[in-house]
From Swiss-Prot:
HAMAP family: Non_canon_purine_NTPase. Substrate binds at T10, T11, N12, K13, N14, K15, T71, F156, G157, Y158, D159, K179. GO terms for molecular function: dITP diphosphatase activity; ITP diphosphatase activity; metal ion binding; nucleotide binding; ribonucleoside triphosphate phosphatase activity; XTP diphosphatase activity. One of its GO terms (cellular component) is cytosol. The keyword Hydrolase applies. Mg(2+) binds at E41, D70. Its EC number is 3.6.1.66. This is dITP/XTP pyrophosphatase. The active site is at D70 (proton acceptor). Binds 1 Mg(2+) ion per subunit.
Length: 200
């Protein structure tokens, strides 16, 4: 039996891979499959609003079901910066290591790990353009910002500097199975699956 297709409003291959690993019962397609699609500007004030904006815009375009995801890191000592600007605050830098190093520079005066508190958060929105239904949920994982960039073939974004609470290493030093069990994205997707199962 063919898997149900859900479109993901992203061109990020790493994000598509994570969603595919967690949502194994569905075929995940993304903006990489519809190159003519023009992404909408993320101009909202919260992670939830941005996620829903992306999901709704794509769902209406394909006249189907789409998921929007907005993920970021919030550093307590920086008043929750970069927050919703996590993806674009360091522009024109695009290399994940460079962006992480730039954030570390802002914390170089703080030399105690317990004073480098942060959290990773993911907001997930699903919009069904046919039935006009929507679901939005935000999850977070508390932790700390490491003192160095932990370069690795695993991970992306801020995985290289974020140590989840209760662990002694950054996401990038974990295998994908472990990260996918404890990440904010996994928590949010679990709630999404509950919603999907309940509306079948």
């Amino acid at each position: 039996m063919d898997k149900k297709v859900i479109y993901l409003a992203t061109t990020n291959k790493n994000k598509v891979k994570e969603f595919s690993e967690i949502l194994k019962d569905y075929q995940i397609k993304s903006l990489l499959d519809i190159p003519e699609y023009v992404e909408i500007e993320e101009n909202k004030k919260t992670f939830k609003q941005n996620a829903l904006l992306k999901a709704k815009h794509l769902a209406k375009y394909i006249n189907g079901v789409a998921i929007g995801d907005d993920t970021g890191i919030c550093v307590k000592a920086l008043n929750d910066f970069p927050g919703i600007y996590s993806k674009r605050w360091a522009y024109p830098l695009t290399n994940h290591y460079d962006i992480c190093n730039k954030l570390l520079d802002k914390l170089k005066h703080i030399n105690q790990l317990n004073k480098r508190k942060a959290y990773m958060t993911t907001a997930i929105a699903l919009y069904d353009a046919i039935n006009k239904k929507q679901f939005v949920y935000q999850a977070r994982v508390n932790g700390y910002i490491d003192f160095q960039v932990n370069e690795s073939e695993f991970g992306f974004g801020y995985d290289f500097i974020f140590i989840p609470k209760g662990y002694d290493k950054a996401y990038s030093l974990m295998n994908s199975e472990l990260k996918n069990q404890i990440s904010a994205r996994k928590k949010a997707i679990d709630k999404l699956i509950e919603y999907i199962d309940n509306v079948k």
